[in-house]
Amino acid sequence: MLSALESILLSVATSEAMLGVLGNTFIVLVNYTDWVRNKKLSKINFILTGLAISRIFTIWIITLDAYTKVFLLTMLMPSSLHECMSYIWVIINHLSVWFSTSLGIFYFLKIANFSHYIFLWMKRRADKVFVFLIVFLIITWLASFPLAVKVIKDVKIYQSNTSWLIHLEKSELLINYVFANMGPISLFIVAIIACFLLTISLWRHSRQMQSIGSGFRDLNTEAHMKAMKVLIAFIILFILYFLGILIETLCLFLTNNKLLFIFGFTLSAMYPCCHSFILILTSRELKQATMRALQRLKCCET
């Protein structure tokens, strides 16, 4: 049985997960409709669709995993099925971070304004940059996946033999976990760099506008601000997501604190949920589609 606080926290986390599924499904449907209507899928819509689909899978996997651990259903679930879920999560999580980073790079190349020849080369050859990101995804995935397999195998051994914990140092567990996530972490660092460069670009642009005596925000400034909101939100939420997964992992190995585990689940569910709604609110097309959907719902009610 769960305590009152545990039940409330689990309800909050579950609500986050369901809202995340709805928000990301909405993004997929809007972009799919646009694809069918225009007979083509733009680069930004491809990234947003891939990001939304990967997050839907992420939400279902972390929710199912959390419920099986909270209600001790892992004993009833075949170990091979749980292991398979873990491998799927590793792949989907990597893809989700890659799509988020690609979105940040897309905003950076489209909006930022630098005179450096490397930036100008990247801006003119955005398609090649996209191919490079795919290669980077494969390399980081191949580098981190073997360690992820080791961590998953360690969890499987631990669940079948609790005395194994004696041979595992806390520092070793933490190091293995961090290195197993080096792929997503390296992509996350690229997103931070893109956000930092966008900030510099905005600062330079603001100084330029002040020097010509303009007291109003122009379209370039608005574009900078929207892109930075998306990137900063991603950075903050991904840190919370990473901490949440880390808390869940440490609870599995080092303590049997169910409340702390559910708190970790609540943190991890915030990232795929909240960021999807931030994307909707900062995208003109998605915001317009949301308003149309709300108007239709009002018409149905009347």
Swiss-Prot record:
Primary site of residence: membrane
Transmembrane recorded as keyword: yes
Cellular-component GO terms for this entry: membrane
UniProt topological domain (Extracellular) ranges: 1-7, 65-87, 150-182, 251-259
Transmembrane parts of this sequence: 8-28, 44-64, 88-108, 129-149, 183-203, 230-250, 260-280
Keyword annotations from UniProtKB, A to Z: G-protein coupled receptor, Glycoprotein, Membrane, Receptor, Sensory transduction, Taste, Transducer, Transmembrane, Transmembrane helix
Protein name: Taste receptor type 2 member 104
Organism: Mus musculus
